[in-house]
Structure formats: C-alpha cells, structure tokens
C-alpha cells in the first residue's frame, strides 16, 4: 500500500500544479498542507471539513473540477485509501456542482 500512498501523494502535487497552470489558482493553504502533512493526510483533512472549499469553487469557475482533491480521491485506484464516509463527501461535493468523474 505504501507505493499507492506515494502515487497518491505525487498526484496531489499534480493537482496543485494543474490548478496553478490551468486556472491561475495559487492554492497556498493546500501547498502548505501537503508540504507539512503529505497528500493523503491533507485529502483526509479536507474531506472531513464541513465548510465550503474555496479551491473547489475556484476550479468550478475555471471548469476544471477534474483538478480537485475530490476527483482524485474518487479515482478507482485510490478509493481503497479512503473510508466510505470520505468517498461519500467527495461524491456529494462534486455532485452538488453537477460533476460526475468520467473514470
């Protein structure tokens, strides 16, 4: 599972880079969190928060919800890293924005 966690952590960095390059969104808090906690712990923390995520809104406005933590979490290969409650939170947030991942 450690290789899967490493892949997930790497993809969390890719999410940051993609959001910055594609949407000119500089996610400073997100960057600090993945630098300090790692990608998996950051994703779990963000999914546990009940408040609206500014980054999700910014990426929605840019029409790039595929670059969200929620979309990454729902990828088939990463689902085993998360609880059903966390997966449900990711699905709900994306569903509220009428986004359905295509994978």
Regions found by a protein language model. Give the residues of each.
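Acidic/proline-rich low-complexity IDRs
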Residues: 3, 55-58, 66, 71-73
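Amphipathic alpha-helical packing elements
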Residues: 16-64
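Polar/charged alpha-helical tracts
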Residues: 10, 32, 41, 85-92
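Charged, compositionally biased N-terminal leader segments and the immediate start
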Residues: 1-22, 96
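Charged, low-complexity surface segments at secondary-structure and domain boundaries
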Residues: 1, 14-18, 29-30, 43-45, ...
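Amphipathic alpha-helical binding modules
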Residues: 63-103
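Alpha-helix boundary/N-cap detector
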Residues: 3, 7, 34-37, 81, ...
């Amino acid at each position: 599972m450690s290789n899967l966690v490493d892949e997930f952590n790497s993809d969390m960095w890719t999410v940051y880079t993609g959001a910055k390059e594609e949407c000119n969104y500089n996610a400073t808090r997100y960057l600090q969190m993945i630098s300090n906690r790692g990608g998996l712990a950051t994703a779990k923390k963000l999914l546990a928060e009940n408040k609206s995520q500014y980054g999700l809104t910014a990426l929605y406005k840019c029409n790039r919800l595929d670059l969200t933590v929620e979309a990454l979490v729902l990828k088939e290969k990463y689902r085993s890293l998360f609880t059903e409650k966390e997966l449900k939170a990711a699905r709900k947030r994306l569903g509220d924005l009428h986004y359905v991942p295509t994978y």
